[in-house]
Amino acid sequence: MTSRETRAADAAGARQADAQVRSSIDVPPDLVVGLLGSADENLRALERTLSADLHVRGNAVTLCGEPADVALAERVISELIAIVASGQSLTPEVVRHSVAMLVGTGNESPAEVLTLDILSRRGKTIRPKTLNQKRYVDAIDANTIVFGIGPAGTGKTYLAMAKAVHALQTKQVTRIILTRPAVEAGERLGFLPGTLSEKIDPYLRPLYDALYDMMDPELIPKLMSAGVIEVAPLAYMRGRTLNDAFIVLDEAQNTTAEQMKMFLTRLGFGSKVVVTGDVTQIDLPGGARSGLRAAVDILEDIDDIHIAELTSVDVVRHRLVSEIVDAYARYEEPGSGLNRAARRASGARGRR
């Protein structure tokens, strides 16, 4: 390298150094452990998700990097401090969702989103964990009918049931009705062994599991016997008018258009309906069109009906679930079949 090149490189390095900024945030001493996490797991999550360099000494967090990166890191850490100060446990998952919210286009505060209590029982509190979940919950409060559409693990059914239980406990409604289509995955009830109740129960088991997670297990059978809580197949809704009820239709992608119309027209006075489903997991036979897809197309412009969409970003199960959802979405994109066939053919030729 010539002396001219050396001087140019030094000048470029100096300009880059000048562009770097430093900032320091003092964390209240009693919140440091909660912010950093067990064995500094939250700090490591911050280091993985933020571009700015982080250094912790005592209760001071020093940030260094490009101005925009440092500004984002300041916002993230301030929000996380507010979350810890509210008494909520901070986890790497909460860190990841908080960063995603602030990187996005919304103006919502992660501390406000992640500390919104929906339902509490024996020290366990159910809250939205992502911005879209918060918007979904707000839509349920503001509208009579809400469609919650998204992949597995986005909390669409669990949050709807939490809102239903809360509405019952606060006397906004007098009963809860939980329903699902009773035929899924290509099975027919008539070919399954057991009584009708024994055949139907496995399809409704996820709803029972969620109920027992939210309410006193000893109270649930009494409420069901009194008709305050009803868990039933969708076919049992026909011919009824459901007043003063919070009604949740789960797995709605497996309804036909006729079933969906029948269900929605059961709506009575003082009732609220939440319809949840995943349009990528339709099990209807013969390629029949999903009633959920049809309803969204037909009803999306009607006032007091809201369509809430959740994505892989809102998956709150294991981190891999979000990646699996995205991988399947890419695999099933139009035209990707040709690419898969080409890859298989190429692989076959390579094995010869």
From Swiss-Prot:
Residues 9-20 have a biased composition (Low complexity). InterPro entries: KH_dom, KH_dom_type_1_sf, P-loop_NTPase, PhoH, PhoH2-like. It is found in: Cytoplasm. ATP binds at residues 150-157. Its main location: cytoplasm. The keyword Transmembrane does not apply. GO terms for cellular component: cytosol; plasma membrane. Keywords: ATP-binding, Cytoplasm, Nucleotide-binding. The keyword Hydrolase does not apply. It comes from the Bacteria. Residues 1-21 are annotated as: Disordered. Gene3D superfamilies: P-loop containing nucleotide triphosphate hydrolases. GO terms for molecular function: ATP binding; RNA binding. PANTHER family: PHOH-LIKE PROTEIN, PROTEIN PHOH. Belongs to the PhoH family. This is PhoH-like protein. It comes from Mycobacterium tuberculosis (strain ATCC 25618 / H37Rv). The lineage of its organism: Bacteria, Bacillati, Actinomycetota, Actinomycetes, Mycobacteriales.
